């Protein structure tokens, strides 16, 4: 599991649907640049069913696994506001994400959340965010490799601090609904997967098919951008791309290329 390979057979419904799609000729055409409409609609519905959060289909972006989703997210976040060029990692997390930051020439800072649980989390976030250089912060919840879950109190603290310092939160949900202390697998019924999205509009969710559906080989995932963030224009993006919003830049200028 630490390597993201549960060793379970891929969900049969996915295998059957993929076979049918190939037989119907999907391999012969390029998908819509914004993402296949059916996939976007079902991703939005999935998020409502299991997280109880409303995100419009336009903000549910199919990606080649969460690896591509986080890479593009880091890249856009670091271009939004001049002076905000650093990503804050709430560790432990996925080491490859730090390598992504290194590849794109950004900076990152990090701290181990083990020493800052509960209200202590607010103090350490204040210490980092008050410097004004943090473009986004990222964490994994449920967490790999430490196998703990952030509490609702801690998620609210992260959301509150994101609002206070206008910082984007990237929530890595690779191990979606794997807090097995709760029955999280019933669609449209509480309890739901915990999320920072209840406490801020400055969020991006990374949802991977690798673990949730044991579909690692196909590298599928969805980056879900909040409605408010999707439609927000940033000075840095306007200067670099001549216009557009966070969401349109993410899709047309990053994912498409």
Residue map of PLM features:
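Conserved small/polar residues in nucleotide/adenosyl-binding loops
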Residues: 255-257
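Short aromatic-enriched loop/helix-cap "lid" or pocket-rim segments at secondary-structure transitions
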Residues: 11-15, 102, 180-184, 216-219
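Alpha-helical elements of Rossmann-like donor-binding domains used by nucleotide-donor carbohydrate transfer enzymes
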Residues: 13, 17, 42, 123-124, ...
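Short catalytic/ligand-binding loop motif for oxyanion handling, primarily in non-cytosolic enzymes
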Residues: 7-12, 145-148, 177-179, 213-216, ...
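Conserved core of the PLP fold type I
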Residues: 26-165, 170, 176-200, 204
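Short coil/turn segments
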Residues: 32-35, 239-247
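N-terminal "arm"/small-domain region of PLP-dependent enzymes with the aminotransferase-like
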Residues: 1-31, 49, 167
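Active-site PLP attachment segment
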Residues: 193-233, 245-248
């Amino acid at each position: 599991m630490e390597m993201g390979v549960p060793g379970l057979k891929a969900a049969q419904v996915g295998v059957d649907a993929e076979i049918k799609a190939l037989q119907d000729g999907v391999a012969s055409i390029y998908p819509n640049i914004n993402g296949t409409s059916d996939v976007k609609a079902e991703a939005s519905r999935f998020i409502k069913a299991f997280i109880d959060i409303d995100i419009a289909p336009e903000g549910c972006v199919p990606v080649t696994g969460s690896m591509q989703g986080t890479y593009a997210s880091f890249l856009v976040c670091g271009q939004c506001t001049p002076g905000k060029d650093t990503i804050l990692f709430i560790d432990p997390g996925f080491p490859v994400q730090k390598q992504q930051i290194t590849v794109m020439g950004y900076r990152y800072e990090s701290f181990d959340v083990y020493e800052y649980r509960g209200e202590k989390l607010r103090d350490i976030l204040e210490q980092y965010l008050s410097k004004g250089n943090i473009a986004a912060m990222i964490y994994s919840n449920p967490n790999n490799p430490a196998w703990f879950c952030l509490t609702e109190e801690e998620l609210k603290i992260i959301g509150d601090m994101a609002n206070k310092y206008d910082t984007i939160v990237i929530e890595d949900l690779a191990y979606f609904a794997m807090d097995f202390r709760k029955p999280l697998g019933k669609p449209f019924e509480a309890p739901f997967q915990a999320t920072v999205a209840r406490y801020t509009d400055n969020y991006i969710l990374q949802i991977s098919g690798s673990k949730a559906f044991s579909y690692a080989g196909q590298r599928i995932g969805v980056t879900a951008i909040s409605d408010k963030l999707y439609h927000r224009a940033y000075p840095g993006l306007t200067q670099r791309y001549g216009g557009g919003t966070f969401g349109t830049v993410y899709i047309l200028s990053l994912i498409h290329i």
